[in-house]
């Protein structure tokens, strides 16, 4: 009887530790680090550094950004399983480019839903081959990935995890379709490829509309403690929005 009680107590302790575990787990080219509560940032250093996010919910996990390829998605999943054994429920394609949607095939293979706006899904369907070719031009080692479309498509803004993960569109910027993802309880904003330390690649950007999109974001007056940049160093305060707006206003318009 005592042994059984001890086993139950130990199992409960393991569950409790898993529920409140914080810190960072790492692999060769990737890390998963707690930002606040159930919100974690992924620093993916394969190809060109990109930063994605993971939300550990009560019933399962939401991944924000599919990562570069099925192989990098698999690496992220290994890190996720070191934090929680709960299933990955869904993965958000935050825009139609390879760094945000290249891992779709892996996530679908484990039964996760791949989620996007209709605008992102339509751009993937029409322009995926072009985006892969563009990626391979700069990164010859990048694989020639086939198109894997999202299987859950929203006509506009959407929420997941019972409102604890909010995805919204503010206008064209780095791409025509890019969305922000906001975690209201933690006051964390994921800037996607729209916000980052450096100006970055503007090949598909609407440079003229970009500042207006950032002004619309600021007009929402979201309570924000932390902004996660989509590339470069991930952790910033809300001042990253004004910082990038100044960069884009100074950029040449084609």
UniProtKB/Swiss-Prot annotation:
Q: Which family does it belong to?
A: Belongs to the metallo-beta-lactamase superfamily. Class-B beta-lactamase family.
**Is Zinc one of the keywords UniProt gives this record?**
yes
In its UniProt record, a GO molecular function of this protein is: zinc ion binding
In this chain, Zn(2+) is annotated as bound at: 99, 193, 231
Q: Which UniProt keywords apply?
A: Antibiotic resistance, Hydrolase, Metal-binding, Periplasm, Signal, Zinc
Name the source organism: Aeromonas hydrophila
Going by the entry's taxonomy, the superkingdom of the source organism is recorded as: Bacteria
The cofactors named for this UniProt entry are: Zn(2+)
Cofactor binding annotation: Binds 1 Zn(2+) ions per subunit.
What does the record list as coiled-coil region(s)?
none
Expression is induced as follows: By either cefoxitin or imipenem.
What regulation of activity is recorded for this protein? Answer: Competitively inhibited by mercaptophosphonate and pyridine carboxylate derivatives. Also inhibited by the binding of a second zinc ion and by chelating agents such as EDTA.
Query: SMART domains from the entry?
Result: Lactamase_B (SM00849)
Tell me the GO BP annotations in alphabetical order.
Answer: antibiotic catabolic process; response to antibiotic
Query: Which EC number(s) are documented for this chain?
Result: 3.5.2.6
The reaction(s) annotated as catalysed by this protein in its Swiss-Prot or TrEMBL entry are: a beta-lactam + H2O = a substituted beta-amino acid
Subcellular location(s) per record: Periplasm
Protein residues bound to substrate: 135, 174, 196, 201
The principal localisation class reads: periplasm
Quote a single Gene Ontology cellular component term. periplasmic space
Short name of any one Pfam family annotated for the protein: Lactamase_B
The role this protein plays is: Confers resistance to the different beta-lactams antibiotics (penicillin, cephalosporin and carbapenem) via the hydrolysis of the beta-lactam ring. It is able to hydrolyze penicillin and imipenem, but is much less active against cephalothin, cefotaxime, meropenem and ceftazidime.
The record's listing under CDD domains reads: CphA_ImiS-like_MBL-B2
| Signal peptide region | 1-27
- Protein name in the entry: Metallo-beta-lactamase type 2
Instruction: Describe its partners and assembly state.
Output: Monomer.
